[in-house]
């Protein structure tokens, strides 16, 4: 029995040593394979053409650049495109297959079936405050309304830029704007915004803090207001609380993968006058408004030219946002 026990122990020890040797051999082999694989990647990477999201390439040329209608262009096999449109467009077209028709037309421009998504919205104002932009490239169709031209330009500013906003309690606190990128954004069915600038003793400058009738009116009965006041000065603010909300917002920079197509209107809205829009660049496409089918056909024709002045899902804040008009 003693000899059998020793033999068993010896067998176990030999098995452990052999297993350890096999595992070390496998580990060394895998290390060798991984090393050769990484070395191969390092050698071929300079020759592989891939997108660079960190480089800022400014776009030069005429502000009224002419876009050529072309069927040739980049093959967007790995990109997605979202087209946002007002619900009225779908109602006017009244065709259950219209999205499939457009998908087939986008296919002729290099966009594979399934890469283009269509999403309607009921109210552009609500959409602009928190736009859900899901795709690599996002194109928003915005119908021009001559009764709210100012609102439209501010809506475009909200959609084309990233904003960080926080609620304001104007009944308890004074507020000041810290920089040109800091704005107060009011939205509602009826927004009348009044402000009273304060001195260092919190006394009103040209107004009485206890009398809102002496406040300066910066907006009256509007649906959307982006208020810009003198930086570094406290203000007491008054708004119609029952019909309006106000938030303290900071413009972080442009959404480079977003473009707006203005549908109709005599002129394209100019948002580049805002000193926080950097650089001062605008690309305009001018086509007469007819029917929604005509609008969508035009978008299909020029989609690749529009995409070329956008950045795919870029997070850089250096380049311009672009505003288009049909």
From Swiss-Prot:
Residue positions binding Ca(2+) 2: 177, 228-229, 301
Signal sequence segment: 1-50
GO MF terms, alphabetically ordered: metal ion binding
Chief location: virion
Keyword Methyltransferase: no
Keywords: Calcium, Capsid protein, Disulfide bond, Glycoprotein, Host endoplasmic reticulum, Host-virus interaction, Metal-binding, Outer capsid protein, Signal, T=13 icosahedral capsid protein, Virion
A Pfam family this chain is assigned to: VP7
UniProt PTM comment: N-glycosylated.
Note: Some rotavirus strains are neuraminidase-sensitive and require sialic acid to attach to the cell surface. Some rotavirus strains are integrin-dependent. Some rotavirus strains depend on ganglioside for their entry into the host cell. Hsp70 also seems to be involved in the entry of some strains. In group A rotaviruses, VP7 defines the G serotype.
Role, per record: Calcium-binding protein that interacts with rotavirus cell receptors once the initial attachment by VP4 has been achieved. Rotavirus attachment and entry into the host cell probably involves multiple sequential contacts between the outer capsid proteins VP4 and VP7, and the cell receptors. Following entry into the host cell, low intracellular or intravesicular Ca(2+) concentration probably causes the calcium-stabilized VP7 trimers to dissociate from the virion. This step is probably necessary for the membrane-disrupting entry step and the release of VP4, which is locked onto the virion by VP7.
Similarity section: Belongs to the rotavirus VP7 family.
Name of the protein this chain belongs to: Outer capsid glycoprotein VP7
Species annotation: Rotavirus A (strain RVA/Human/Japan/KUN/1980/G2P1B[4]) (RV-A)
